[in-house]
């Protein structure tokens, strides 16, 4: 598992593809069956390894793909290191938003449900 930040095990900056694969791997097997609402998020990664991917909860299943999602509920924009801190539970998404390390656009109520997905990953 790669630690916080965007450095690989070889201390090289991770590409967007590597960041995406790491996120997808960390959430494989996440149980979202109790989430009955449709949730669709787009994540825009900024900085040297910029790119976009989406996370969707649909019919109790989690989908993560390296594409933009145009009919999304919310868009999260942050650097990769902030994203990994949130995923690892080292930074609360609300705190990251308050500290302006995470930008959120769209339905804030549905955006807050991201915490449910993260909590079910463990």
Where are the regions that the model predicts?
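Feature captures hydrophobic
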Residues: 2-122
């Amino acid at each position: 598992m790669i630690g916080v930040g965007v450095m690989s095990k070889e201390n090289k900056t991770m590409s967007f593809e590597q960041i995406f694969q790491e996120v997808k791997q960390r959430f494989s097997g996440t149980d979202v069956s109790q989430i009955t609402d449709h949730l669709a998020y787009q994540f825009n990664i900024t900085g040297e390894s910029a790119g976009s991917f989406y996370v969707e909860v649909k019919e109790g299943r989690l989908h993560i793909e390296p594409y933009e999602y145009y009919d999304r509920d919310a868009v999260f924009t942050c650097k990769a290191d902030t994203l990994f801190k949130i995923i690892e539970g080292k930074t609360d998404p609300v705190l990251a938003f308050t500290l302006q390390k995470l930008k959120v656009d769209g339905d804030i109520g549905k955006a807050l449900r991201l915490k449910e997905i993260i909590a079910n990953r463990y």
